[in-house]
């Protein structure tokens, strides 16, 4: 057996249809495009968002909302996370939180929230604190510093 002897399995190779090559071919004259109309023309494609000339849905619906570009987006950390990760008396900074993988990025700052309980006195330095987080940290003898 040689490489030149290899043939495809009978019926596995379909012959390409050549359109517009005479009426006898079965795909002559209109070449399978029917008569007239947009889809019979060259590049005659109707896009999926086209609604037949009526005002499209995205123009019928009202505009609403906006993006507040002055809004501060804080990376959020709860006091229960500080309890698990940091030792008693340790200083907690945004850089240490980033380093230990508590937050993925600092964004516009770090905000400490009061979800969970804390028993270790920590010095927490952050950009913002919720009132419950501030109260819980100071209740166990910790310090709160706003950057």
Swiss-Prot record:
The Gene Ontology terms for molecular function here are: rRNA binding; structural constituent of ribosome
The UniProt entry, under HAMAP family, shows:
Ribosomal_uL15
Biased segments, Basic residues type? 30-46
Q: Which organism is it from?
A: Thermosipho melanesiensis (strain DSM 12029 / CIP 104789 / BI429)
Q: Which family does it belong to?
A: Belongs to the universal ribosomal protein uL15 family.
Its domain of life reads Bacteria
InterPro entries per the UniProt record, alphabetical: Ribosomal_uL15, Ribosomal_uL15/eL18, Ribosomal_uL15/eL18_sf, Ribosomal_uL15_bac-type, Ribosomal_uL15_CS
Which keywords, in A-to-Z order, does the entry hold? Ribonucleoprotein, Ribosomal protein, RNA-binding, rRNA-binding
Q: Name one GO biological process term.
A: translation
How is the subunit organization of this protein annotated in UniProt? Part of the 50S ribosomal subunit.
Record lineage: Bacteria, Thermotogati, Thermotogota, Thermotogae, Thermotogales
- GO cellular component labels: cytosolic large ribosomal subunit
Ranges for region Disordered: 1-54
GN (gene name)? rplO
Its recorded name reads: Large ribosomal subunit protein uL15
Q: What does this protein do?
A: Binds to the 23S rRNA.
């Amino acid at each position: 057996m040689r490489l030149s002897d290899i043939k495809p399995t009978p019926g596995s190779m379909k012959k390409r249809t050549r359109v517009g090559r005479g009426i006898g071919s079965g795909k002559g004259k209109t070449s399978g495009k029917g008569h007239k109309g947009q889809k019979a023309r060259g590049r005659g494609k109707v896009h999926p968002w086209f609604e037949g000339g009526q005002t499209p849905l995205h123009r019928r619906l009202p505009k609403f909302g906006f993006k507040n570009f002055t809004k501060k987006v804080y990376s959020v950390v709860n006091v229960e996370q500080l309890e698990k990760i940091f030792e008693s008396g340790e200083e907690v900074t945004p850089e240490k939180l980033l380093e230990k993988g508590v937050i993925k990025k600092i964004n516009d700052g770090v905000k400490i929230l009061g979800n969970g309980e804390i028993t270790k006195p920590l010095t927490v330095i952050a950009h913002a604190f919720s009132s419950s987080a501030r109260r819980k940290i100071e209740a166990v003898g910790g310090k709160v510093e706003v950057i």
